Amino acid sequence: MYGWYELPKQEFLNSEQPVQIFTTKKYQILFRIGPERRRKAGMPTGVYY
């Protein structure tokens, strides 16, 4: 039972971590572009996902 529990937990961590890193980098890039620059580019000021 212990071995059965450890394997899915490890798979969950391995699959989730790169997604979190990708989303945080995407957030950093979006927030580096200021709202005024987004308005000039014609992009929506609100962040949509």
Swiss-Prot record:
Family matches, as InterPro entries: Uncharacterised_Ycf15
Alphabetized, the UniProt keywords read: Chloroplast, Plastid
Q: Which Pfam families match?
A: Ycf15
What is the annotated localization of this protein? Answer: Plastid, Chloroplast
A Gene Ontology term for the protein's cellular component:
chloroplast
Q: Does the keyword Plastid apply?
A: yes
Q: Which family does it belong to?
A: Belongs to the ycf15 family.
Its recorded name reads: Putative uncharacterized protein ycf15
- What is the source species? Jasminum nudiflorum
What gene does this protein come from?
ycf15-A
